[in-house]
């Protein structure tokens, strides 16, 4: 493989400890109509300068962000404190906070773009598909000590991609219709030219070469334009997991963050022990993403390079048992145990469909139910 010029080398900050951070996207909905409200700029202006609340592509969205946290409990407490402030301001303006992978009935054509050069450039390039990005998600950062670990961890973590997506799937509806998918968001987001599954590089120089080529050919100008579902975040010294659909409540989010933290730290420790991390062929990884997006917790997933298959919930049972010692060491055993409650009582996409069925297909009731789940 060709080496990259010294000017194209990418420094990875590195994290001395396996810290965790969370970015949680929320839509603003009108308290009466339950449709989206393009008032994020006024909400953010009233909150004032803070690293904990960010603007996003669309003016109907605010993103709540933690600081650098030692464990899941600390991250959830951080989010809780910020959300109390944000929700008070939002409610004072006649709106509510809403989180799911998609809004059940909102139409993309009425949504306003946030005024920022990078968003304008995104839409200029991606056109219709870019304007369709009426989606919300959760991003989890986990600290990694050294660049040489990053790509092996990302490539191996793809084996658990369908588990993470199926558990968080919350976007069955699009523009008033049931799509038949558990996560329509996952299918939508990958239409952007630099989004979707990451390439399964095994070394940092391979990633550096990729970024060099992307910049040289004008595909990207900045690192943050690589919008992979799992990607390195060199300036933070983290791996950023962007698989999740939007999550409607803190308890469920805590379980998903704990699972993510444990998975990454487990892979990190196995690397330290000299293990070669397992990977699957990219065609299996791609198929698993589709199966999880389509069938959610009913997906039968591919487990390994030998093409063995298993129901995702059965594999989750064993995975949670295996990760218990890691969870205890990360002080998130209780949150990890909550993962099983998601598939025992129903993921968000299943709950949404139940509400719609109980209300004769009324999607306003679905929005009501999702808003009510955010208990602070």
Swiss-Prot record:
Listed transmembrane segments: none
GO molecular function ontology, one term from the record: ATP binding
EC number: 6.3.2.2
Catalysed reaction, written as an equation: L-cysteine + L-glutamate + ATP = gamma-L-glutamyl-L-cysteine + ADP + phosphate + H(+)
Coiled-coil parts of chain: none
InterPro entries to which the protein is assigned, alphabetical: GCL_type2/YbdK_subfam (IPR050141), GCS2 (IPR006336), Gln_synth/guanido_kin_cat_dom (IPR014746), YbdK (IPR011793)
One Gene Ontology term from the biological process aspect of the record: modified amino acid biosynthetic process
Family annotation (Pfam families): GCS2 (PF04107)
Alphabetically ordered keywords of this record: ATP-binding, Ligase, Nucleotide-binding
PANTHER family (alphabetical): GLUTAMATE--CYSTEINE LIGASE 2-RELATED
Protein family per UniProt: Belongs to the glutamate--cysteine ligase type 2 family. YbdK subfamily.
Protein purpose: ATP-dependent carboxylate-amine ligase which exhibits weak glutamate--cysteine ligase activity.
Protein name stated in the entry: Putative glutamate--cysteine ligase 2-1
Lineage of the species this protein comes from: Bacteria, Bacillati, Actinomycetota, Actinomycetes, Mycobacteriales
């Amino acid at each position: 493989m060709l080496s990259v010029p010294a000017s194209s080398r990418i420094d990875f900050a590195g994290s001395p400890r396996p810290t965790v951070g969370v970015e949680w996207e929320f839509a603003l909905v009108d308290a009466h109509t339950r449709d989206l409200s393009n008032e994020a700029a006024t909400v953010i202006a009233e909150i004032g300068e803070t690293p904990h609340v960010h603007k996003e592509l669309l003016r109907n969205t605010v993103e709540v962000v933690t600081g650098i946290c030692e464990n899941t409990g600390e991250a959830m407490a951080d989010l809780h404190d910020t959300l109390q402030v944000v929700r008070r301001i939002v409610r004072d303006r006649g709106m509510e906070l809403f989180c799911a992978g998609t809004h059940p009935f909102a139409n993309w054509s009425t949504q306003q773009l946030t005024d920022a050069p990078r968003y304008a450039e995104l839409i200029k390039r991606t056109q219709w598909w870019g304007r369709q990005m009426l989606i919300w998600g959760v991003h989890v950062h986990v600290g990694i000590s050294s660049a040489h670990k990053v790509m092996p961890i990302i490539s191996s973590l793809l084996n658990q991609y369908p588990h993470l997506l199926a558990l968080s799937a919350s976007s069955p509806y699009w523009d008033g219709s049931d799509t038949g998918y558990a996560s329509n968001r996952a299918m939508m987001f990958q239409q952007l030219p630099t989004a979707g599954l990451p390439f399964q590089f095994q070394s940092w120089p391979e990633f550096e070469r990729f970024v060099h080529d992307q910049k040289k050919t004008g595909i990207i100008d900045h690192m943050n334009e690589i919008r992979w579902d799992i990607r390195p975040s060199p300036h933070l010294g983290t791996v950023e997991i962007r698989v999740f659909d939007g999550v409607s409540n803190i308890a469920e989010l805590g379980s998903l963050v704990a699972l993510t933290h444990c998975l990454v730290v487990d892979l990190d420790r196995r690397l330290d022990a000299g293990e070669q991390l397992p990977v699957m062929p990219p065609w299996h990884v791609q198929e698993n993403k589709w199966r999880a997006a389509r069938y959610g917790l009913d997906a039968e997933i591919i487990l390994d390079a030998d093409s063995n298959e298993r129901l995702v919930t059965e594999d989750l049972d064993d995975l949670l048992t295996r990760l218990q010692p890691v969870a205890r060491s990360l002080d998130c055993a209780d949150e990890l145990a909550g993962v099983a409650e998601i598939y025992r009582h129903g993921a968000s996409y299943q709950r949404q469909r139940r509400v719609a069925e109980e209300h004769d297909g009324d999607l306003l009731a679905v929005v009501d139910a999702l808003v009510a789940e955010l208990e602070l």
